[in-house]
Amino acid sequence: VADALTRADALCAARGTRLTALRRQVLELVWTGHRPRGAYAILDDLSQAGGRAAAPLTVYRALEFLVAQGLVHRIESLNAYIGCPAPGRTHTGQFMVCEGCGNAQEIDDPQVTAALAACATEHGFRVSRQTVEIGGLCPHCQETHPDPEPVS
């Protein structure tokens, strides 16, 4: 968590953007627990931490800023956010999302990116953003859950 905050401070300073106290606190909460966090869970944690009470819109604006800066990613299928381990480096969002525990892991596979770009080009489609979410079971949940339905 400390490394993520240090990288965020440096990245925002280099870009001339402000990592306000609230944005920093939201980023810290996203990284705490190392699993995707929803906006309302973050809001609850902010309320429990004391200090000023934040409105949902304020938390969403902080999350939008963090996403725009590449400090966090939004996991669409979970409607939650996860810290980016490589902020400042251009990459696409590729995630393995566990359907058992809800954990998510970011991967950055250039072959996946290239294959999707080639497919888009073949169909005359211009890509503006790319997010891939692969649902399944993490190694821990595979031990306790039956096999998921295979994708054909």
Residue ranges of model-derived segments:
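Pre-recognition alpha-helix immediately N-terminal to the DNA-recognition helix
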Residues: R24-L29
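Basic amphipathic alpha-helical segments that dock to polyanions
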Residues: V59-Q69
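Non-DNA-binding regulatory cores of transcription-related proteins
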Residues: V67-S152
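Short helix-capping/hinge SLiMs at alpha-helix to coil transitions
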Residues: R15-T17, W31-H34, A49-G50
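Short, Lys/Arg-enriched N-terminal segment that forms or immediately precedes the first helix
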Residues: A2-G16
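DNA-recognition alpha helix
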Residues: G38-R52
